[in-house]
Amino acid sequence: MSTRKYSKELVDGPNQAASRSMLRGVGFTTEDFSKPFVGIASTGAKVTPCNMHINELSEIVENSVNSSGGKGVLFNTITVSDGISMGTQGMKYSLISREVIADSIETVVGCLAYDGLITVGGCDKNMPGCLIGIARLNRPSIFIYGGSIKPSDENTDYVTVSEKVGEFSKGSINEDELIHYEKISVEGPGSCGGMYTANTMASAIEALGMSLPGSSSQDAISDSKNNDCVNAGIAIMNLLEKDIKPSDIMTREAFENAITVVIALGGSTNAVLHLLAMAHSIGVELCLDDFTKIGKKTPVLADLKPFGKHYMSELNANGGIQPLMKNLLERGLLHGKCMTVTGNTLEENLKDIEPYTNNEIIKSFEDPIKEDSHLRILYGNLAKDGAVAKITGKEGT
């Protein structure tokens, strides 16, 4: 199987001299034309902390692809920020941005005949947008998560500020105290640090098998995240050699794995919306009732914000989500034979994973946060086609 299934039509032969000439103008060499082209879709932008570092990560990916025998080609797509636009007219654009991301990635890769694709995302809608684009194209692909922000020195984050707005409205704190939290709570790059939408979807994608092990929990600014980018450049060449496509990875069983991990982590209700769209894009039948079926046998184990105590950076320091996935696999709650972007199956990836050193963040099956899913699918006259609610067991406390 040729690793240049698409690019050869763009650059091979005398008739494509003009195309090659244009590519030489952006730095291609004669040798590059015989290599597989790998598109690198960056969601980097300075509109939000979630994405302000992603262009730099994407350049690491590009260099890794180039040094691994491919030709990396970096391009950008958009991002917006729900956290900034929340409560304003700007939120009307939030879900639309998912489709713009998917459409733009599909457009560039399809037009310019890239043989493989690596996408790098940070803010909420980046993850499903990238995966929908990947699914439509169905070329060897990897998703890289931009990583989480660390909490402030006072152990606060963006959501803390939202809570302080409520306290100010109630009269519990004054405006100076509110401004203090505003100034100190978001310090540098990375996605919101709890199990909010971004970390939920990053974890779902790792469980799905479309990102490298560990990608979902790594800190945005860290050696491990830089290494994730280097390793992705190496891994994409393996996927091209073996012709492992998203359709080989994003199977019905893999989506069931993703749902299971989302529930165990106490993840966002938005996962329902996004996983359904991702499954549809790859031709996998998935419905609301699947979340109920899986939820009846899957406990919530993670004591993570917003309803818990801990941040993703703390879970990362304790091993990330891989030990959790191994626990779920050993309990028969995950499908171990699913292929992943490592070129190995899920159970092969998890074989040598060490257990957590304690149960402070990820609880044991004997002492769960909740014995079944926190995600509830509701039907009624207000939602004839279904609705999603989150029930943590702490309501009213």
Specify the residue positions occupied by each region the protein language model found.
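Catalytic or ion-coupling anion/metal-binding cores of large enzyme and transporter domains
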Residues: 1-52, 57-77, 83-84, 89-94, ...
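Well-ordered alpha-helical segments embedded in enzymatic catalytic cores
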Residues: 100-107, 129, 257
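Short, charged beta->alpha transition segments
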Residues: 24-28, 103-108
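Hydrophobic pocket-lining residues that define ligand/cofactor binding sites across diverse proteins
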Residues: 65, 108-109
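A short, small-residue-rich loop immediately preceding and capping a beta-strand
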Residues: 109-130, 142-145
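Conserved phosphate-coordination/catalytic loops
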Residues: 95-99
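Short, glycine/acidic-rich beta->alpha junctions
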Residues: 100-101, 122-126, 253
